[in-house]
Amino acid sequence: MSASPTADLLILGAGPVGLTLAAECRKHGISFRIVDQNPTHSVYSKALAIWSNTIEHLAGLGLAEKFLEAGCPVRRGIFQDNGKKIAEIPITEGLDSPYPQPFVLPQSDTEALLGRHLAAQGVIVERNTRALDVRPQEDHVEVDLQKPGGAETVRTRWLA
């Protein structure tokens, strides 16, 4: 395997957390690489809602409006038993936030929005790339990656 110098941070995984971390790194000038073993972002969702504090965080990245436009606000929860409403709970009461309600937005859409945001800034998610081995060292981490073109050993200060 070829050893290659790399960025300060290697992000393994381009799901919502990895993509958000990449956006934060880009915003703050931290050098990074982001890799994912999948050929594209997921078309399946493991999560359907984005809550107030997440929208507040996305606002700091300049993304809140795009997410709000793509999602559907949830203002109340309705519980039913055999088709009969048994309870209704307002979701927004007591939330001290500029975004007082959660939004329904499939995880696949979340990943697509974050991916487009990063691509517009020139960030490339290295797809079809997976970690084979991780070796912590005294002042860095070595990670063996399997890529479509072969294997690569990456040295990085931090691993996420």
Which residues does each predicted region cover?
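Glycine-rich Rossmann-fold phosphate-binding loop(s) that bind the pyrophosphate
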Residues: 14-15, 37, 107
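Beta1/beta-strand and adjacent pyrophosphate-binding region of the FAD-binding site
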Residues: 2-17
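Glycine-rich FAD pyrophosphate-binding loop
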Residues: 24-47
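A conserved short coil-to-beta-strand element within the FAD-binding core of flavoproteins
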Residues: 127-142
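Active-site-adjacent segment of FAD-dependent monooxygenases/related oxidoreductases
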Residues: 43-121, 132-135
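Core beta-strand elements of the Rossmann-like FAD/NAD(P) dinucleotide-binding domain
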Residues: 5-7, 149-158
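Short hydrophobic core segments
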Residues: 11-12, 106, 154-160
